[in-house]
Each structure stands twice: as structure tokens, then as C-alpha cells.
């Protein structure tokens, strides 16, 4: 493992670009990463892809690295209903836009099984032509009628196992410790600590 980490050590031409146009998501990522990884954020118009979640995330990272001409971190989030064999999955954003929180609950009306899991996939591409690395976090829970502030996606309808609160009702510090995003970013932080990347650009560009 140490040999692999040493082999991965390299200089990055500039800080990692986290690709997002979602202010709430950016706020959460900044809270979780703190100053552990130097990154900047940028909204890019990447095409919406279909396929398996990890494949989608990797392909987005390849496209983003080509556009940015540098290292990028992209995120894809899934909400998977076990009764529906994993749907809505990576298409949760569109399901939520079309049906709202009540509609997500209605998808499971005919099923006793309300269990679900939230999955977050971060893909890191160190530059154009580089094969992306993926970091996956999962949190199991269940789908419930919406509770809590409705300002961050499907948080009000997802109640993680072992808790009486939905994501939306939780203090941010608690959610960030147990969430799918928090778990995936913990793996990203581990990778950066082991790889010991050095950013060449001091930010003057």
C-alpha cells in the first residue's frame, strides 16, 4: 500500500476544481473538507448521462478534466429504493423535480418496504486523459413523509437508520458525520493524505 501511495505522489498543476452549481452542496463539501484539500468550485454544463452510477461519475470527471485542463472532483448522488430495485438511483434529481417530496413517497405506496439507501460517488481525475478514481459512500435508511426544511433536495424524506430525524431535521454537524456524502469525502481525504499531492500553482494565475 505504501508503495502505491508513493507512486501516486505527484505535483498537481493547480488546485482541484470541484464541479458543482449547487450552493448547498458546495457549502456541505466545504464544511466536511475544511482546509484538508485545496480546491475551488466551478459550474460546468456537463451532459446528463445514463448508465451505472460509477460509470456516469467517471465519464463526467473525464469531460470536466478536459474542459478545466486540470484536476477535477465531480460528485454524483443516488437515492435508491430497495422495493424498486434501486430506482430512482442516479435519476433522483429528475424524479424530485417532477414529483416533489410527496411524489417520492407515492412511488412506494404499493410496497411495505420503505427502505432505501443514499449513495454518493466522487470521481477524481488528475487531468485530461487521466483515468478517474472513485470514492463511494452509502447510508442506509428509509423513505418517510417530508419533515424539516425543504431547501436541500430530498433531505426531508430520507431518515437514516438509527435516527429519528430526517437529514433535513438534523444539525448539519451530525448529518455530515453520517451522510453518504460525508462517508465518500472521508475516503477522498484519506486518498489525498496518502498521495501527498503538491499544488504547483500558488493561486496567482
Curated annotation (Swiss-Prot):
Q: Where in the cell is it found?
A: Cytoplasm
Keywords in alphabetical order: Cytoplasm, Hydrolase, Magnesium, Manganese, Metal-binding, Nucleotide metabolism, Nucleotide-binding
- Pfam families attached here? Ham1p_like
For this protein, what is any one GO molecular function term? nucleotide binding
Q: Which GO terms describe its biological process?
A: deoxyribonucleoside triphosphate catabolic process; nucleoside triphosphate catabolic process; nucleotide metabolic process
Residues annotated as binding ITP are 20-25, 60, 76-77, 93, 152-155, 175, 180-181
Entry cofactors: Mg(2+); Mn(2+)
Q: Where does it primarily localize?
A: cytoplasm
Question: What is the official name of this protein in its record?
Answer: Inosine triphosphate pyrophosphatase
Lineage of the species this protein comes from: Eukaryota, Viridiplantae, Streptophyta, Embryophyta, Tracheophyta
